[in-house]
Amino acid sequence: MPQHYSGERRQYRRELRLSVPSCISLLYWIGSIVIGSVIIFWGKYHCFNDGAAHWARILQLRSGEIIPSFSKEYPEWIVYSEHGKIITFNNTAVNSPFVYFPSLIFRGDFRISSIATLICAASLIAVAIRIAGCYANIILAIAVLPTTFFGMIFPTADAITNSFSLLFIAVVLCLYQRDGALHFRHIVLLCVLSIMLGQVKITCSIIVLFVFFLLPKTTDKKMKVSLSLPVLCAFTSMWLWRMKTSHIAVAPNRVSLQ
């Protein structure tokens, strides 16, 4: 086969690998927004798991109280509704403001915050699918799981936790598949993402260890050592927030059942 035909075929395959994830990510984003919006506007509020507790934490953050202070008068953490009514909750008090950023940026009632959360979470996952390359189907399979999808349709910490975790994994997979060695700018990108990863639910911070899959991408010893920086950033970010909220004890007998 002539050499120029071989080159054209490789170029075609490369373009195909890039176009397929793009189509999948777009279809996922549109489908998630449409189906999620239908559920938000016509679904039942009481079907949202712990929706009241997450909403109470959002109201608390909107009032400017980043670190909850314990009320001696009530046995739980409290926040005041817009009508002055006291709302008690405790199992979401330790959550970082980062996991509620859609509701903090797009202020409004529960439904508006639900739409904002859905759009932001679906967008993060769509980007993850787009950049994951040949691993796009794996990201998509996780994204369409009922646990993942239904956690995106109301203001919850799970929405950003799941979507951002998938985005972080996709970035690592993208760097793993790219031609050429790692550069310092890639380490900086991973460090920035790791700082944010440290602010999601503590159980997902372990995902930062995926960066060690990039060790074969470089022969430079300094670059190999620098891959530990994202891990350090993630666990430092997590530790600083946990230190600020270490006084909050969420015991089983004090967890909201709403």
Could you describe each region identified by the protein language model?
Residues 1-42, 133, 224-232:
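Start-transfer (signal-anchor) and selected internal transmembrane alpha helices
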Residues 11, 111-136, 167:
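Transmembrane-helix motifs of polytopic, lipid-linked glycan transferases
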Residues 51, 55-108:
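Interfacial juxtamembrane loops and adjacent helix segments
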Residues 139-147:
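Transmembrane and membrane-interface helices of multi-pass
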Residues 149-150, 186-202, 206-213:
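Membrane-interface alpha helices of multi-pass inner-membrane proteins
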Residues 154-161:
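Short acidic/glycine- and proline-prone juxtamembrane loop motifs at membrane-interface regions
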Residues 171, 176-196, 224:
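Short hydrophobic alpha-helices at membrane interfaces in multi-pass membrane enzymes
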Residues 203, 207-258:
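Membrane-lumen/periplasm interface segments of specific transmembrane helices
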